[in-house]
Curated annotation (Swiss-Prot):
This is Glycine--tRNA ligase beta subunit. Keywords: Aminoacyl-tRNA synthetase, ATP-binding, Cytoplasm, Ligase, Nucleotide-binding, Protein biosynthesis. SUPFAM superfamilies: HD-domain/PDEase-like. PANTHER family: GLYCINE--TRNA LIGASE, CHLOROPLASTIC_MITOCHONDRIAL 2, GLYCYL-TRNA SYNTHETASE. One of its GO terms (biological process) is arginyl-tRNA aminoacylation. NCBIfam families: glyS (TIGR00211). The gene is glyS.
């Protein structure tokens, strides 16, 4: 009879940013173990709080089913000698299976005959399996850094305090991570019962909520926080900033969420909202509140882990905590504005960008020139782009950014605006870091885009230029930088070539770079970013590979090619022409001679090769302006017309003819055919 199963691991406070991933991995690992063991169930649900990880499995089988295991022995030919007596190989195999050779059955197949032993294996009861399965599931958790506690050598992400394993109402005895299974479960630190006993898996998680004042259901806690925060924001006439990453973190910090609203002095709103929000969200884990026009209100929402009869005291305590941080931001803002941003430029000489690549002032000089070069290529204002490049890193020397590091860029924008800099220049100081993550907004102006690309390109070329390409870790965020450049070029439709950009960036480093292949390495790295990006966009790997095989170094051009090949693949002729291109490629690869530049029409003998040659010549001329215009979809649609003449050619023409002149001419025809497709992509790489 199937029963509900529970395992709860009580711990010290788990890392909040890792809590969901730990719980999900625990469930996935345990479920995989159950499947491998042949144990059926009706669903698994994970629970997670700061002080526990738990799984509840509905209707878990009480044991494995019995099964017949077939063990094949030696082939009959080697199991018996010429006189029909068992060989040592046969006897050893039989002895290992606890039988005699005479007791073995025989297995006959089309490939031969073997000795066979069928053994009935009794299924094990689930209670004898789950402890080991749970231990393996926990051992497989994504723990970046484990810790030891006490005098034990046992390691886990945090010290383990309790373990409860129940199958129905039966306690499963066992020890995991040095802790023996009992019926004791710990409640909330400050409310309810600090610990109590649980009689049955069926009682979980309700008993924990009723007696322990702990809401074990992670998603339920999150829902309470979201609903409570929205309601609280509406009560003060605003909208809560409920960024999912912060909501997840707060959910992982509390076992009994209570949503409260607090306020701060109106005068602090004179400080740029980004600085206030940084300290509220980053330091205090508060949710800021905005009005309908997205202006920050003097209120914030927070979540406490205790239900108090006097919530006013908790609110006042949080207001008291945040006030000095906001006062610091106000002080830094007022102090920083006493000096123009440009006056901080010489101070960048004191800040090292990278030991071999120089100071941030050196980087600023390179960004300034590179931004001007890019601006010229895309039609942006060169003077504004260079001015923005010159000011780009000056805010790193301000008190505000030194204290609140995540405000870099945005504070530069505010200080530049205060100094009377051009609006586009000021905006570029903020937008130089865009896109900051997958799906983030792009720089909104061409000036901003010039500076953003210059900054990222300088970092890429510099770090690759000293031989520090990312492997596992990526301390300079080169993958993000490469993808950012590609997104800006593709999504804004800039006609930029990576070869030119990298060459210009490389030239600005003088003799600082030691990697002679930096240009190739950077471009290959950037093209590699296309693969992950376009896969995420829904394009299949073979389509992406078909285009990358041509190594297109203009990102906007790559985008057009991928979309054209994707469209081509849906055509009826695609599969046949892909196979034909693969065949042509194989034929040409085996030929080590020199092909002619043009087809000799006088040497064409078979009707099929005459038709194909004529079609190829016509298309080659007709498609030349289409290729130049980059209209690859139209080109591939026209090339699809080659399906029938290509099929007829391979059906009726011997390519590798005995006559050398005929063979060379036919190979030249096939080469010209293949090059028409290779002008766009290597479609031979397309899969069925």
């Amino acid at each position: 009879m199937a029963k509900n199963f529970l395992i709860e691991l009580g711990t010290e406070e788990l890392p909040p940013k890792a809590l969901r991933s730990l719980a999900e991995a625990f469930a996935a690992n345990f479920e995989a173990g159950l499947k491998a063991a042949g144990l059926a169930h009706q669903g698994i649900k994970w629970y997670a709080t700061p002080r526990r990880l738990a799984l509840k499995i509905a209707e878990l089988d009480e044991g494995q089913a019995d099964k017949i295991v077939e063990k094949r022995g030696p082939a009959i030919a080697s199991a018996f000698d010429a006189d029909g007596n068992p060989t040592k190989a046969a006897q050893g195999w039989a002895r290992g299976n606890g039988i005699t050779v005479e007791q073995a059955e025989r297995l006959k197949t089309d490939k031969g005959e073997w000795l066979l032993h069928k053994e009935e294996v009794k299924g094990q009861p689930v209670k004898g399996l789950v402890v080991e399965l749970a231990a393996k599931a926990l051992a497989g958790l994504p723990i970046p850094k484990a810790m030891r506690w006490g005098n034990s050598d046992i390691q886990f992400i945090r010290p383990v305090k309790t373990l409860t394993i129940l199958l129905g109402d039966e306690l499963i005895e066992g020890t995991i991570l040095g802790v023996a299974s009992t019926r004791t479960i710990r409640g909330h630190r400050f409310m309810g019962e600090s610990e109590f006993t649980i009689d049955s898996a069926d009682q979980y998680p309700a008993i924990l909520e009723e007696r322990g004042k702990v809401m074990a259901d992670y998603d339920a806690r999150k829902a309470i926080i979201l609903a409570g925060a929205k309601k609280a924001a509406e009560a003060v006439g605003g909208i809560a900033d409920l960024e999912d990453e912060l909501v997840e973190e707060v959910t992982s910090l509390v076992e009994w969420p209570v949503v409260l609203t607090a306020k701060f002095e109106q005068e602090f709103l004179n400080v740029p909202s980004e600085a206030l929000v940084y300290t509220m969200k980053g330091d205090q884990k508060y949710f800021p509140v905005y009005d309908q026009e997205k202006n920050l209100l003097p209120n914030f929402i927070f979540v406490t882990n205790i239900e108090s009869k006097e919530p006013r005291h908790i609110i006042e305590g949080n207001e008291k905590v945040v006030r000095p941080r906001l006062a610091d931001a106000e002080f830094f803002f007022n102090t920083d504005r006493k000096r123009p941003l440009i006056d901080r430029l010489p101070e960048l000489e004191q800040a090292i960008f990278q030991k071999q690549l120089g100071t941030i002032k050196d980087k600023t000089d390179r960004i300034t020139e590179l931004a001007g070069y890019i601006a010229e290529q895309i039609g942006a204002d060169v003077e504004k782009s260079q001015r923005a490049g010159l000011l780009a890193k000056c805010d790193l020397m301000t008190s505000m950014v030194f204290e609140f590091t995540d405000t870099q860029g945005v504070m530069g924008m505010h200080y530049a605006t205060h100094d009377g800099e051009d609006a586009q220049v000021a905006l570029a100081l903020y937008e130089q870091y865009m896109p900051r993550f997958a799906g983030d907004d792009l720089p909104s102006t061409d000036v901003s885009a010039s500076v953003a690309m210059a900054d990222k390109l300088d970092t890429l070329v510099g770090i690759f230029g000293i031989g520090q390409a990312p492997k596992g870790s990526d301390p300079f965020a080169l993958r993000r930088a490469a993808l950012g450049i590609l997104r800006i070029i593709v999504e804004k439709g800039y006609n930029l070539d990576l070869v030119d950009l990298v060459a210009k960036a490389q030239s600005l480093f003088g003799d600082k770079l030691t990697n002679a292949n930096v240009d190739t390495d950077v471009i290959d790295f950037m093209l590699g970013r296309f693969r992950a990006w376009y896969q995420d966009e829904g394009f299949s790997v073979d389509i992406i590979q078909a285009v990358l095989a041509r190594r297109p170094t203009k990102p906007a051009d790559f985008d057009q090619r991928v979309k054209a090949v994707s469209h081509f693949r849906e055509l009826d002729a695609a599969e046949s022409l892909a196979a034909a291109n693969k065949r042509v490629g194989n034929i040409l690869a085996k030929f080590d001679g020199e092909l002619a530049q043009e087809i000799d029409l006088a040497l064409l003998q078979e009707d099929a090769e005459k038709v194909l040659a004529e079609k190829v010549e016509i298309l080659a001329e007709a498609l030349e302006p289409v290729f130049i215009a980059g209209n690859y979809q139209e080109a591939l649609s026209r090339l699809a017309e080659l399906r029938e003449p290509v099929d007829a050619f391979f059906d009726g023409v011997m390519v590798m003819a005995d006559d050398e002149a005929l063979k060379l001419n036919r190979l030249t025809l096939l080469n010209k055919l293949r090059n028409l497709f290779l002008d766009i992509a290597d479609i031979s790489l397309l899969q069925k």
